[in-house]
Design a protein with these regions (language model features):
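Classical Sec-dependent N-terminal signal peptides that target proteins to the secretory pathway
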Residues: 1-18
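Cell-wall polysaccharide-cleaving catalytic domain and substrate-binding groove, primarily
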Residues: 16-170
Length: 170
């Protein structure tokens, strides 16, 4: 019996470890665009792309704490880990990380024609995973994200960075 428990624990630990390794790749990709410095301007205050919505003391945020927030409060909390295709998972994480999560999710839900709730629920995940042409889905996600950004009043100021990010995140 003890041997079965040890085997089960080892198996579950491996799954958790593998999930974190996959996430590390996704997170590192997003940090290419976010940077690691503290930023305070008339729009926001952030560090590692983490805003005050996730951490009250953004200025003193450590890289480890930023990683934990990104993993637990964004990646896992919004079920991004349930997206099967790595490139789609990477793009969706970056979008949600860089935007108001509910707004990004609503735009994704509208695009894939599921009930718009603002929550990355099983219906949304299933529709994403069942999308037959991954390249087309990524193209449509990029187009939808860029079209949304064009509606923002700060678009002209940040458009070059935003366009570059969307074109190169996956």
């Amino acid at each position: 019996m003890l041997k079965k428990i040890v085997i089960l624990f080892t198996f579950l630990s491996t799954i958790s470890f593998s999930t974190e390794i996959m996430f590390q790749k996704i997170y590192s990709n997003t940090l290419r665009f976010e940077g690691k410095t503290y930023i305070k301007n008339n729009i926001e205050e952030s560090k590692y792309g983490i805003s005050k919505a996730y951490s009250k003391d953004v200025k003193n945020l450590t890289e480890k704490k930023a990683f934990d927030i990104a993993y637990n409060k964004i990646y896992k909390a919004h079920n991004i880990d349930k997206i099967e295709n790595e490139k789609v998972r990477m793009f969706v994480f970056d979008w949600i990380y860089n935007s108001a999560p509910r707004g990004a999710i609503k735009r994704i839900q509208k695009l894939i024609d599921v009930k718009i709730t603002g929550n990355m629920n099983i219906e949304t995940i299933t529709a994403i995973n069942d999308f037959s042409d991954t390249d087309l889905l990524i193209h449509l996600l990029k187009e939808t994200r860029l079209n949304y950004l064009k509606t923002l009043k700060h678009y002209e100021k940040y458009k070059n960075g935003w366009q570059y990010r969307i074109a190169n995140v996956v």
